[in-house]
Amino acid sequence: MSSPTSRVVAGREITFPVPVVSASVSGAAFLIRAAVVRRLIAAGRQSAVLDAAGAEPVALPGGRTPAIMIHVRYHDVPGNVLGAYHEMGLAFQLKVPGHGTLVHIHELPVDQDFTLAAGNELWGFPKWKGDMVGTAGGALDDARLGAVGSAGAGGVDLRLDTRVGVPIPGSQSLAMNCVQVLDGQPVRVTAEANARGGRMRPLSGARVTIAPGADDGNADVARFAEAVRELGLDRARALATFSYDTFEAEFQAPERIG
């Protein structure tokens, strides 16, 4: 099946590839229990489609799956087609027969309406709306996620500290390959990125905290907090924490799997 060249979102025609011309990003990688990843995916709305595609959590020795938590701030500049916004992501590595190891984005809250619609309708990214604060990029990012109207309070806090890390020199070419569900079908989503102004802190630098009140009221925030708790991310030591002051990317049209 051929990939689309464009799609209309909220009355606007969006042409692929979709550019990100200016953003900053901070994140951390973890090893988490594959059995918990499997259980979280099975409880989600996309589980039947992912099962039919044969997707399974990557299981390293000890039954562990690589995971990432990330905070991205998209800047208010011309050329950022989806606008200026924050997003916080939780993603896992899955094996998909015939496609190797792909990343599955499990949660992707954002703080603006248009990117929420675009992420879901263009690529099947599981975006929902919350309030977020934080810098992203730089050597210290105190990212906070809460319900709409909370100014980031009462949800999940993600502190990413690379101040004692090592600089990553020059420009880094990065690639993203995801498996998501779009219009009831499994799709592969790819992006090519370039990042500069990086720092890396091995074996530490991240602290994930579930704030008081995270389980009360907002169902999306409560679900995110429960996933953090079940995965043990609020107790885990990061494999590495990273930040990039400058991040540019192009997101390609989704490709049907199978």
Give the predicted meaning of each segment.
Residues 71-116:
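Hydrophobic/aromatic-rich structural module bridging two neighboring secondary-structure elements via a short loop
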Residues 28-30, 69-72, 90-92, 108, ...:
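Generic structural hydrophobic/aromatic packing signal, biased to beta-strands
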Residues 48, 110-112, 126-128:
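Generic alpha-helical propensity signal that fires on short helical segments
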Residues 32, 41-43, 92-93, 107, ...:
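Generic hydrophobic/packing signal
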Residues 1-85, 221-224, 231, 237, ...:
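N-terminal domain-onset segments
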Residues 2-9, 116-258:
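Interaction-surface and assembly-scaffold signal
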